[in-house]
Amino acid sequence: ANEIKLILQRAKLYPLAQPLATIDARQIEDVLKSSPFVNDAQCYKTQSGQVCIQLTQRTPVMRVKADNGDDYYVDNHGGVMPNTKYTSDLIVATGQINKWFAQNYISLLSKSLMVNELWRNQIEQINVLPDRSIELVPRVGNHIVYIGRLPECSSKRKREEDINNFVNKKMDRLEKFYKYGLSQAGWNK
């Protein structure tokens, strides 16, 4: 709320104590939508003289810390969000990542991992190798999980479906290994 107030104050659009006739709801919407953290903004004036502002926030699904020095977040729609002073418990993607690959492939991998409670808690890092194959780094245990290259497709819908199926198949196998293999040998072997 304070960040929104600051955005509106900087743009000289903060509506508190302003005459209703001087408040431009459309301009408030446009300024708020230009924020990298706002997905959508609706602003309107009521019959009773109030100004209502409704926001939907962009939801980061991973943080990218690429070998080339890039450091940013990617949201659930594949959009890039700048790094901020706020921290979030998200999967960190590292390695040979450009923004296009992060937005179109790694974000889909991260989304697929985040919907499963086990993987949301167990996987802390995605590492992209020079050949674009993927390694996953778990929080628990002294091992790296190599899952290979993600399926490539030009259609966004098909790509999302293919990556989700690929991840589910790989992670189902990994879960069985954890359940039946590591339960016998131990996590740190």
Residue positions per predicted region:
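Short extracytoplasmic/periplasmic juxtamembrane "stem" segments immediately C-terminal to an N-terminal membrane anchor
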Residues: 1-2
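Charged, solvent-exposed interaction patches on well-folded alpha/beta domains
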Residues: 7-34, 39-189
